[in-house]
Design a protein with these regions (language model features):
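Cytosolic regulatory/linker segments at or just downstream of nucleotide-handling modules
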Residues: 156, 185-237
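Acidic/histidine metal-binding catalytic segments
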Residues: 98-99, 139-150, 191-195
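Allosteric regulatory "coupling" segments in signal-transduction proteins
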Residues: 116, 167-172, 209, 213
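Regulatory cytosolic signal-relay segments
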Residues: 1-48, 205
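Alpha-helical scaffold within the catalytic cores of cyclic-nucleotide enzymes
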Residues: 74-92, 108-149, 174-175, 180-183
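Catalytic strand-loop-helix junctions within cyclic-nucleotide turnover domains
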Residues: 105-115, 149-168, 188-190
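Catalytic/regulatory signature loops of cyclic-dinucleotide turnover enzymes
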Residues: 152-153, 161, 174-195
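Catalytic NTP-binding/metal-coordinating core of nucleotidyl cyclase/transferase enzymes
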Residues: 40-121
Length: 237
């Protein structure tokens, strides 16, 4: 995707997205425009980009809908549809839902040499799509949904997690933990990324170095970059 990262509308039906929201992972879906995990020997080690998303202030939002849980689900699903669409357009796979956010992989289910580009394009796309949703939520619901993103790239292992009685396909590795930690520190409309991710797109992306930083739950420090998409705008040229 290095040439022209313009995000086009996906070619699949809304029903596919509705079905997707009821599943744990995108690879379980068989539908036009939705990726499936290929049949490959397991486990397999690949270099991939991992992305986590998270709604900022979701706890306060749940309090707002304390007496209308169905309304909360409506709001969350409206947001997740935007997120899933951006990920699918860029060739990513939703590995699982994590509370109000998602964990998506690029390059884990199959070789994608441009997995970093794809992850960054998806992040830019989903924040922009969420901003469009905010125009509706502000008018209809009286509040905004703010989303943060964390991205890390590196080696991961893809394989069955569990036992013969019950197992599921999982993606494991240090970069998964790093991306999960980064998203907790990403502000509204921000993408936090590791130095590996930044250097892969630095010549085409404006970003700010936030300094060497310790990430809770791991030893040592990480080179972390922050990209702020004010108003949900950004591009990868």
């Amino acid at each position: 995707m290095r040439e022209g990262l313009a995000v086009a509308e996906p070619q699949y039906e809304p029903d596919d997205l509705d079905r997707l929201l009821q599943l744990r992972a995108m690879y379980e879906v068989r539908g036009p425009g939705l990726l499936t995990w290929p049949s490959v020997p397991m486990p397999v080690v690949r270099t991939a980009s991992i992305m986590f998303t998270d709604i900022r202030g979701f706890t306060r939002l749940t309090e707002r809908f304390a007496h209308d849980p169905a309304g909360l689900l409506e709001v969350l699903n409206a947001h997740l549809k935007k997120v899933l669409r951006s990920i699918a357009i860029c060739g990513g796979v939703v590995e699982k839902f994590v509370g109000d956010g998602v964990m998506a992989t690029f390059g884990a289910g199959g070789e994608q040499p441009d997995h970093v580009d794809r992850a960054m394009a998806a992040a830019i796309g989903l924040i922009g799509a969420n901003e469009a949703l905010n125009r509706k939520s502000a008018a209809d619901w009286g509040f905004r949904l703010e989303v943060g993103v964390g991205i890390a790239s590196g080696p991961v292992v893809v394989g069955a997690v569990g036992s013969a009685d019950r197992s599921e396909l999982g993606v494991l590795g240090d970069v998964v933990n790093v991306a999960a930690r980064l998203v907790t520190n990403a502000g509204p409309g921000e993408v936090l990324m590791t130095g590996t991710v930044y250097r892969a797109v630095a010549d085409r992306l404006q970003s700010e170095l936030t300094s060497q930083s310790a990430v809770r739950g791991r030893s040592g420090s990480l080179e972390i970059y922050r990209m702020a998409l004010l108003g949900g705008r950004g591009e990868l040229t």
